[in-house]
């Protein structure tokens, strides 16, 4: 593999990070430890959730409205443990049919409106990723990051486009990746991550939450092997110019 010639941007130099996830728990499952560190140092971290996440709700008797309430309840509970105070939802159908370019337009709108200096999402190029929501979200975010300054490419809100003045996005961080170039030390924020994960009751029963925490207990230790800390989260962090033509 030929590495990019561009430097790896410093995620922890960011002051505003936009984390865009396919489902309501992906940011926290993958990167709650990292995010808790960011918010602890004063970084503003904002969440956007692409799908309505209704397909994974474990209560088979819940109506869609009841499921939506439960999902939001979980998200706000998890957010309280890691310092998230602002969330937005795009409400595309979970594991369903929706237009990729509509998603990209919505994400582009939020990038232009919020003006983050760093963006985080799932790696759409993860080997063997079988969930299209993850692939489409990661790719749409990558394109939106590249196209944010090209105002001839419309977002979903013309008023946002008209008011937008180009800003600098220092980098993009991909989680759920098998090609990390940064391992973040989450030893100090591991308890916050566990508390966030244990907030997700709508899609996990108690046994499922135990399995989830156990899996990421092992994973956090595995990725920290050879590092000077006990627990880590793997990220692929790229300069935005590395997203096109293999620079």
What name fits each language-model region?
Residues 1-114:
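Active-site rim/loop-helix segments in enzyme catalytic domains that contact anionic ligands
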Residues 1-20, 97-247:
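Metal-dependent de-N-acetylase/amidase catalytic core
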């Amino acid at each position: 593999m030929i590495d990019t010639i561009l430097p790896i941007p410093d995620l922890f130099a960011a002051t505003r990070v936009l984390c865009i996830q396919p489902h309501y728990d992906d940011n926290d499952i993958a990167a709650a430890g990292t995010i808790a560190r960011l918010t602890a140092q004063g970084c503003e971290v904002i969440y956007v959730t692409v799908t309505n996440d209704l397909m994974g709700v474990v209560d088979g008797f819940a109506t869609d409205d009841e499921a939506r309430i439960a999902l939001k309840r979980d998200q706000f509970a998890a957010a309280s443990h890691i310092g998230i105070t602002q969330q937005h939802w795009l409400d595309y159908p979970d594991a369903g049919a929706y237009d990729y370019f509509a998603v990209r337009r919505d994400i582009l709108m939020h990038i232009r409106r919020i003006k983050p200096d760093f963006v985080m999402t799932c790696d759409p190029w993860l080997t063997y990723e079988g969930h299209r929501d993850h692939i489409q979200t990661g790719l749409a975010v990558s394109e939106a990051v590249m196209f944010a300054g090209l105002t001839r490419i419309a977002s979903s809100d013309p008023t946002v486009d008209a008011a937008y003045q180009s800003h600098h996005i220092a980098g993009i961080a991909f989680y759920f990746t098998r090609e990390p170039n940064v391992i973040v030390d989450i030893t100090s924020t591991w308890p916050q991550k566990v508390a966030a994960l244990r907030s997700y009751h709508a899609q996990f029963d108690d046994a499922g939450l135990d399995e989830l925490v156990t899996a990421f207990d092992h994973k956090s230790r595995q990725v920290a092997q050879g590092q000077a800390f006990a627990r880590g989260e793997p990220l692929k962090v790229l300069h935005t110019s590395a997203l096109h033509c293999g620079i």
